[in-house]
Amino acid sequence: GGERQLDGVFRLNPGAYHAEANNGDLLAKWNVAAGSKVGSFKIYIERRNPKKIGEMELIVKSGDASSVKIPLYPVLRAMGVSDSEMQAKFGEDIYKANQKASRPNALARFHKAIENRKRSTKYAPPTSAEAAQFLRDTFDGAEVSAETMKSSLGKGFEKITGEALLLSAAKLVGISKGKVKEDDRQSLSNKRLFGAEDFVYEHLTKGA
């Protein structure tokens, strides 16, 4: 009679969810499948500070509980997104705001945040080319649900591509201007039931 039953739990499908947080921040929360190097991350758009309206940042978790904020513009460029594509999706003003907010060390900071989570004294900073390749490889190794992405961004991405990040950022711009609706993270269509066998499988296959 000491047997315990592990009930299933609903888990958010891997994908991008665009909505206002409880503190008023407008975010794209990217829920990534277990086992990816990047882990879950966010894209933030500034809409309160009048001097920084429209500036976007990629927010990734580093080794401890802290997060690292990285300007989105150099991330998109490294992922193969052109300036003209950003102009078309963001509009001229927001495109220029993000180009201006770019920092030359952005990709190196992404590399350090992900690759040095254990705070090793042996960490070696990458070259610019290495940092850009690391960014591409890291996102390419992150899986998302094609169904969720189709619902959220209109295209069934299975990996995180430059286009997926561009469309996600563009959706934030649209929401910030009141032209696009937020996503409903609580919708059951964005969740799946996760049972005991799923936890075991995840542990065995992902090394979680």
Where are these regions (language model features)?
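N-terminal non-catalytic structural scaffold regions of very large proteins
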Residues: 2-208
